[in-house]
Amino acid sequence: MATKKAGGSSRNGRDSAGRRLGVKQSDGQYVIPGNIIVRQRGTKIHPGRNVGLGKDHTIFALIEGRVEFVTKRNHKVVNVKEIASA
């Protein structure tokens, strides 16, 4: 006779790794073309001037400049402001 009862198998115990989403370049930060500004699911933050939108809704810089977050008509919008050449 067994002195211990057989342990039942659990059907839980799995989890997926976090997707590393969020703002990657903050307001006022210097960016170059191609820099990722925001990684997101859906357009939580909308693209504005001088930024592109990837097929996975990633917002990235199209020009060299400074990141600017603004609110327009209840939408968060991100722009890249061109730096005036000296």
UniProtKB/Swiss-Prot annotation:
Residues 1-26 are annotated as: Disordered. GO terms for cellular component: ribonucleoprotein complex; ribosome. GO terms for biological process: translation. The keyword Ribosomal protein applies. Pfam families: Ribosomal_L27. One of its GO terms (molecular function) is structural constituent of ribosome. Keywords: Ribonucleoprotein, Ribosomal protein. Belongs to the bacterial ribosomal protein bL27 family. This is Large ribosomal subunit protein bL27. It comes from Rickettsia canadensis (strain McKiel). The lineage of its organism: Bacteria, Pseudomonadati, Pseudomonadota, Alphaproteobacteria, Rickettsiales.
